[in-house]
From Swiss-Prot:
Monomer. This is Isopentenyl-diphosphate Delta-isomerase 1, chloroplastic. Substrate binds at residues 90, 125, 129, 142. The lineage of its organism: Eukaryota, Viridiplantae, Streptophyta, Embryophyta, Tracheophyta. InterPro entries: IsopentenylPP_isomerase_typ1 (IPR011876), NUDIX_hydrolase-like_dom_sf (IPR015797), NUDIX_hydrolase_dom (IPR000086). Its EC number is 5.3.3.2. It catalyses: isopentenyl diphosphate = dimethylallyl diphosphate. Residues 104-256 form the Nudix hydrolase domain. Keywords: Chlorophyll biosynthesis, Chloroplast, Isomerase, Isoprene biosynthesis, Magnesium, Metal-binding, Plastid, Transit peptide. It comes from the Eukaryota.
Length: 287
């Protein structure tokens, strides 16, 4: 893993060490309580913005679970070549002011899980999500955290470890149902998308595909609804979103994948030839 020194940055303070505390599944998932074993990066590469550490008065109405995740989770900051340059809170990484002013770019992943009938599992994000509440999106979308197991670049192992963790956290899918070695990383994309006036996304997103029959028990703090769709059903969902029927909305990252890659890759899902289209060398800059 190559670290770049941000020569324009202020002197940064190494983060305090915290155990991982995710949403309500934390209470029922003992292994999620294991603290990170990662030693902090040097102070000059650790990005912490004290000015917004505690948020502001406008955040007072934020859901307690989402607020905790916003301040406890440390995202991995990268440059446009996906080289790690530091880390910062989930809160700061999703503030459009900081995204625009400091060009904060963080690493993310998007899981596309298909069952044995080659139907794609979609989720509707919960109403309490800070960014893009109640939009429909792919199976799971989140961030590798700044911890040893999720910083591993080789074979995208860090992103795959994070995907397994969040599939349990968001959808209650047991780790044994989604072995890390069953994820196929197909590509990376870089995009920016505002959610509202305050929040947004600026991500370098790992696109992970997996074909498994799984048990699902959605976490209501994260997920409002789920559904499996075949190709025709997804096309109908796209039509409704484009027409604005029933207020249906899709996440911008999901739409980018649909418009640029998904249906071509779906052919390879059905043929069992996903590795033939994998391209982890290219970073697709999409708008």
């Amino acid at each position: 893993m190559t670290l770049l020194l941000n020569t324009t940055a202020k002197l940064y303070i190494a983060p305090r060490t915290l155990p991982f505390t995710s949403s309500s599944t934390f209470a029922r998932s003992p292994f999620l309580r294991i603290p990170s074993l990662l030693k902090p990066l040097s102070p000059l590469t650790a990005r912490v913005s004290l000015s917004s550490t505690m948020g502001d008065s406008a955040d007072a109405g934020m859901d307690a679970v989402q607020r905790r995740l916003m301040f406890d989770d440390e995202c991995i900051l990268v440059d446009e070549n996906d080289r790690v340059v530091g880390h910062d809170t989930k809160y700061n990484c999703h503030l459009m002011e900081k995204i625009e002013k400091d060009n904060l770019l963080h690493r993310a992943f998007s899981v596309f899980l298909f069952n044995s009938k080659y139907e794609l599992l979609l989720q509707q994000r919960s109403a309490t999500k800070v960014t893009f509440p109640l939009v429909w999106t792919n199976t799971c979308c989140s961030h590798p955290l700044y911890r040893e197991s999720e910083l591993i670049d080789e074979e995208s192992l860090g992103a795959r470890n994070a995907a397994q963790r969040k599939l349990l956290d968001e959808l209650g899918i047991p780790a044994e149902d989604v072995p890390v070695d069953q994820f196929t990383p197909l590509g990376r994309m870089l995009y920016k998308a505002p959610s509202d006036g305050k929040w947004g996304e600026h991500e370098l997103d790992y696109l992970l595909f997996i074909v498994r029959d799984v048990s699902v028990n959605p976490n209501p703090d994260e997920v409002a609804d789920i559904k499996y769709v075949n190709r025709d059903e997804l096309k109908e969902l796209l039509r409704k979103a484009d027409a604005g029927e029933g207020g249906l909305k899709l996440s911008p990252w999901f739409r980018l994948v649909v418009d640029n890659f998904l249906f071509k890759w779906w052919d390879h899902v059905e043929k069992g030839t996903l590795k033939e289209v994998a391209d982890m060398k290219t970073i697709h800059k999409l708008t």
